[in-house]
């Protein structure tokens, strides 16, 4: 009996040799102290946008707005409006053209809408087109006009003939544009409504009633 008890004692696992277990947190402690609710993060304050740094000044009246809008539509239809073309780009296109060739483009000056680039005897140059009190005039000139295209027609027909033929983006013009130009030149802008035409043709003539 003593021998068996001794063997049993030798084969037994002592309490000290057992792996220690980490104490687990009691459920009572977690339930008794619930986690505090998270506070919502404050929304970042977005600064108000500064006034837009626009190229053009604000219109002084609704009539000025209508006149510039009408002028822009006519420019889109004329064929020699080159949009945001730079001064250098305009002069390069005019350099090999005959004297008097011109084009209209957007002005880079903050106080002007448009600029006139023309091939002079001394080379290409650009002139600002001012719009003041509802009228157009060239920089350095006192002659004013209700319409930008009346200004261009004036300098095309002037004795000094400052302007010649416009530089169009498309060299070959459609036949209907050429016919319209001839009709306007023969009848006159003020008499277009008297021509016995159907409304479609009359609207087409009045869409660009100039001789340029």
UniProtKB/Swiss-Prot annotation:
Q: Which GO terms describe its molecular function?
A: cytokine receptor binding; insulin-like growth factor receptor binding; kinase inhibitor activity; protein kinase binding
Chain residue ranges for the region called Extended SH2 subdomain (ESS): 68-79
Query: Would you identify the family this protein belongs to, as annotated?
Result: Belongs to the SOCS1 family.
State the name under which the record lists this protein.
Suppressor of cytokine signaling 1
**Coiled-coil region:** none
Keywords tagged on the record? Cytoplasmic vesicle, Growth regulation, Nucleus, SH2 domain, Signal transduction inhibitor, Ubl conjugation pathway
Q: Name one GO biological process term.
A: macrophage differentiation
